[in-house]
Amino acid sequence: MDLIIFAHPDNKRSHNAAVLQYVKSRLTANGKEFEIIDLYAEKFDPIIRIVNFDVPSGFEEVKDYQDMVRKADRLIFIYPVWFYNMPAILKGFVERVFTSGFAYDFSIGKDGKPVHARKLEGKNAVVINTFGHGEEMFRKRGTAAAEVLDKLVLDFCGIKSKRVNWFSVKGVAILPGEIAKKIDAALA
């Protein structure tokens, strides 16, 4: 089962909405089962509060999301890159859902050194991003912040990922064929 995590406030007319519709159509055409978490439509609360640390269950209100992640074979993230990073709502989702004990863990080994456990190993992900500027600007400014999700967070939890970047989306009304081909390849 695939789990789509969509993080854009406009799920009808935005470039990200076009990507979402395309991904849904491809998964349906290929007979794939999928669920969608639309963070803005669900009014996901991205804020960690002190109470989350004060009770043994911690992040009880995100257990359903954790169950969805646990059940999924593949995660498909669709979001714009704003100021070279993911939207705040998605960062909050990652921080509240991909928690210690669920997505990763640390213990002390026999040698007294920390041992890192990737608890979501075996899962895959596709990260699809839109950018308002061209690839040249992205490369010039650096890619590290925009790639935090796949290169750091997902890998840290044991999830292997593929990435599709759609540059210079401003003024483009439809999903270009070259981007559709890249998405198809990532979903294959």
What are these regions (language model features)?
Residues 57-147:
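Helix-loop-strand module that forms the ligand-binding subsite of alpha/beta enzymes
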